Amino acid sequence: MSILFKIFASTLAVVSVVNAGELLNFENERDIIRGSYIVVMKDGTSSSDLKSHMNWAANVHHGNLAKQGPSRSIGFQFSFDIGGWRGYSGKFDNDTLNAIVNNAHVKYVEPDRMASATVLKIQKNAPSWGLGRISHTFRGFKNYLYHSSAGEGVLAYVVDTGIDINHPEFEGRAEWGINVVDEVDTDEHGHGTHVAGTIGSKTFGVAKKVKLVAVKALGKDSRGPDSGIIAAMDWAVKHAKERGILGKAIMNLSLTGDTATALNEAAERAVEEGLFLGVAAGNNNRDAINESPASVETVCTAGASAENDEKASFSNFGSLRTSMAAPHVCGVAALLMSSEGIKAQEACDRIKKLARPAIRNPGNSTTNKLLYNKSGF
């Protein structure tokens, strides 16, 4: 969880300045990337203000490096502008960081850290009981029933380890979008391809006509920095806007980490801009309010259930939306957006309204509702 930063080693002096930003930190420092930071500007900062600020920060950084000699501090990595939520990330020395924190245009600075894909237990060539379950009001059915529109006209951004876009299960409906984590434009892990398959493959997909876009933000170890995930969301919002499909686009985030202010705010803005966000609650068997971006109120957070309609033993819990995994939720969102013509911003409420009270022993303050695709059975 992000808290106000009080002590930053012994080398950084935090100076009190009127209207200065705040330096945040995580209670659990396990996944922090040392020396890397996300800088978020104050509300109302224009794009030209951001550009001027970054020019100023670059000059400060270069000046400090010149005084200190060779350094690993490399400066800027990404810049963000999601519906007016603006900022940037980079690696900075302590003197530069101190100057940035105390700049009047800065809202806060948060250490960058590594987020991880939620673990998937994959049984190869196994029948998907989940498809049968979400299309029936009672368990025990194996057939999958769904509206014939099958998500046609909806675009799904899969922010993950990439997608094997040439896999025959995707029937040419998958395309490569952007890679913000490494130089390898393919899925070296398999997590992203599995997630994409659950959303929209011809055999195991919930929405079998949805188009899929690979947005690679996690590497072959299924981990990636928050800054890259934010950059991926920023790219997806702009891409959807350029294609004129805001309101008809969804984003799956089957990844998690401790609560992070910047990542949560970026997710909020992506929803405000017109994307449906389906997010994994996490696999740590704890309240999802402690996870990002699962703790964001406006995203559709999904926990996992078992075949007997009980909460899966590994799934997180809390007062956060329907059960079943995030890719299933994204698939149902695509179905409803295609068949009913609803907008992305309406899809989560529609999903919650359709969901059935079927989950047994869901956990503290947790919904007992199970995902349902409105098949009529």
UniProtKB/Swiss-Prot annotation:
It comes from the Eukaryota. This is Subtilisin-like protease CPC735_012930. Residues 1-20 form the signal peptide. GO terms for cellular component: extracellular region. Glycans are attached at N252, N364, N373. InterPro entries: PCSK9_ProteinaseK-like, Peptidase_S8/S53_dom, Peptidase_S8/S53_dom_sf, Peptidase_S8_Asp-AS, Peptidase_S8_His-AS, Peptidase_S8_subtilisin-like, Peptidase_S8_subtilisin-rel, S8pro/Inhibitor_I9. Residues 36-114 form the Inhibitor I9 domain. It is an enzyme of class 3 (hydrolase).
